[in-house]
Amino acid sequence: MSLHLSNVILHQLCKNDQDELVVKLRPASLENDTSTENLVAELHRVFHSKAGKGFGSFQSDSEFQFWLQEMRKGERDFYDFSQISANRLKEELIKYPFADEGILVFAEYQSLATDYLFIGILPMNQSLKVTEGLDIDATDYLDITKMDIAARIDLSSYDTDRESNRYLSYIKGRVGRKVADFFLDFLQADVGLDTKQQNQVLMQAVEDFCADSKLEKQEANEYKKQVYNYCNEQIKSGDEVQISELSGELPPSQDGTSFMDFTKEQGYELEESFPGDRSTVRKLTKYVGAGGGLNISFDSLLLGERIFYDPETDTLTIKGTPPNLKDQLSRN
């Protein structure tokens, strides 16, 4: 990939003899060479591919934002910025139960004509290597694919549009780890773009467009499948759902109204682009539900053909069970 590296530095988060988390600061930035460029390129790729990211923007009195502005103006060098930010990050991190040890990386770079600042904690793991004497020895390595404490600032968007609610993005982390809260506190930022809500609004707009266009059931299912296929491809490639691009792939209504025009005319508050949410868009082609010991999922086109729902009795009737399920049932 095309990546231009401006600055990168590593610091270390580790426990001292009192089991307290401390920062071991590197005395200078790393050299910009093939190894550091490859590291940052991999960090960019892995972060870009992570699903379920959160978005936000700085609070007006954010100290971190003030330091960042100083660096962008040349009033504070990158090393000093990384040092003061690393200490602030450590002070916030110790407030949380996931105060992990690891390698703290700050990287300023450009990719595809966009400037970024990346901040992340990379877990260290051990593996085995074969020495020149053909012996087996232990070796440490950065487990980049497992990182779940990372944030990235789109500096180009930040410089041109301070009112944006999404120039800051962060990995939300595993359930129960409150990584989102940590990064918002560390960066002194507020939650911005709600990607889940944007996906839900898109799904409602698709439903309403099909109803407003008076599409037959099969036509509506085909329309929803097209939307799902587009969104799913965007998710798999790590790209965002572009409403104008999606609209261009969909047939207009009978009166010639495009999907994009429909969303604007009806007042759906959709961003021009946003990350797709796999669990939400899946509901375009499937009915999914779980609870009370049941976990049910079936293609939407089966409703009314092999699967019937009676709302009065709250009963779901399935005609023709899958062979493997039928086999299990017949043995009991």
Curated annotation (Swiss-Prot):
Pfam families: NA37 (PF04245). GO terms for cellular component: bacterial nucleoid; cytoplasm. The keyword Cytoplasm applies. GO terms for molecular function: double-stranded DNA binding; single-stranded RNA binding. The keyword rRNA processing does not apply. It is found in: Cytoplasm, Nucleoid. Keywords: Cytoplasm. Belongs to the YejK family. PANTHER family: NUCLEOID-ASSOCIATED PROTEIN YEJK (PTHR38772:SF1), PTHR38772. This is Nucleoid-associated protein VIBHAR_03026. It comes from Vibrio campbellii (strain ATCC BAA-1116).
